[in-house]
Amino acid sequence: MIENVKQTTSEKLLLVLLIILGIIAFYIFVILPQKCLFIKNYNPKEINFKNPKNIAVLNVNCGNIIIKLYPSISPKSVDRFKMLITSGKYDGTSFHRVIKNVLVQSGDLEFGKKNNLDYLYVGTGKSGYGAINSELNDETEFKIGTVGMARTNKLNTEDSQFFILLRDAPLFKGEYTPIGEVVYGLEILNTIKDGYPREYVLRPDFINTFKLLVN
């Protein structure tokens, strides 16, 4: 008769560890990449734009988010935005504040960079170029895909941080500075890691690159 061989404690622990590692590997290499599987990635060079000088391409893990800027509506804010884009300041910056189905926010150049992320202060950082005045109007709608300048609870404190709406926000009209709108890749925004149930994100996603279509 063959007797059952009992597993030692160390063998049981090793088995549990292997199972855990297998689950982690399955998530990283199988589940995680699937969030981009059915997302269309747009190539801006294959699209004809009426005014390509006002097109910005925000690249994240699942592809390109193409933004049409509003220089005629908010000229000073768009100038600041373009300057930060062309100088590469936004590259490697976190989406530090993401409210599921509401908005994504990025642009903290002081405390939100990938190589220097400070969870204690992220969201309060500045660009080093100083604040600019708010450019408010009662005509531009804040709808899904609208890009706006973030600020503190005071006017004229816009700097480098910006947000993109994931749903209509009519109460934002006349309260925030609109600088553009997403024209392609809106669905990609929904793949950016959110902070649910909080607003601020632990181990956030980052901007890979942010470029103007025409410099």
Region spans (language model):
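Cyclophilin-like peptidyl-prolyl cis-trans isomerases
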Residues: M1-N215
